[in-house]
Amino acid sequence: MDVTRLLLATLLVFLCFFTAYSHPPPEEKLRDDRSLRSNSSVNLLDFPSVSIVALNKNSKQISRKEAEKKRSSKKEASMKKVARPRTPLSAPCVATRDSCKPPAPACCDPCAFCQCRFFRSACSCRVLSLNC
């Protein structure tokens, strides 16, 4: 019985030493601001200063008017887009979403292009830009 207690005691001591030495040492804490500034990866002086400006009612109304003008001009610009003249279709061409493997001719749609996947084993004519 004394032998088993002795073995258990040595095992307990061994486990205590093992757990104590297996943990990494605690990191040293930075004690002053100088070491914090030198060790930090982000320098606060790199960022621009922020200026606060008070807005009055006139400036708010002007900005709203400008925003409305921008919105209306964007809408008019999108409505006024001129369609490009399309090139005449050549007889040997590939329709959209059909196979266009490299020896095949070009795609019929001028806005389409041949997109290949799986190491150029599966190719098809695709149209990505709707505004073309």
UniProtKB/Swiss-Prot annotation:
Residues 63-79 have a biased composition (Basic and acidic residues). It is found in: Secreted. Keywords: Disulfide bond, Glycoprotein, Knottin, Secreted, Signal. One of its GO terms (biological process) is melanosome organization. Residues 61-87 are annotated as: Disordered. Residues 93-132 form the Agouti domain. One of its GO terms (molecular function) is neuropeptide hormone activity. Residues 1-22 form the signal peptide. Disulfide bonds join 93-108, 100-114, 107-125, 111-132, 116-123. One of its GO terms (cellular component) is extracellular space. PROSITE patterns: AGOUTI_1 (PS60024), AGOUTI_2 (PS51150). Glycans are attached at residue 39. SMART domains: Agouti (SM00792). It comes from the Eukaryota. Pfam families: Agouti. The presence of a 'disulfide through disulfide knot' structurally defines this protein as a knottin. Involved in the regulation of melanogenesis. The binding of ASP to MC1R precludes alpha-MSH initiated signaling and thus blocks production of cAMP, leading to a down-regulation of eumelanogenesis (brown/black pigment) and thus increasing synthesis of pheomelanin (yellow/red pigment). This is Agouti-signaling protein.
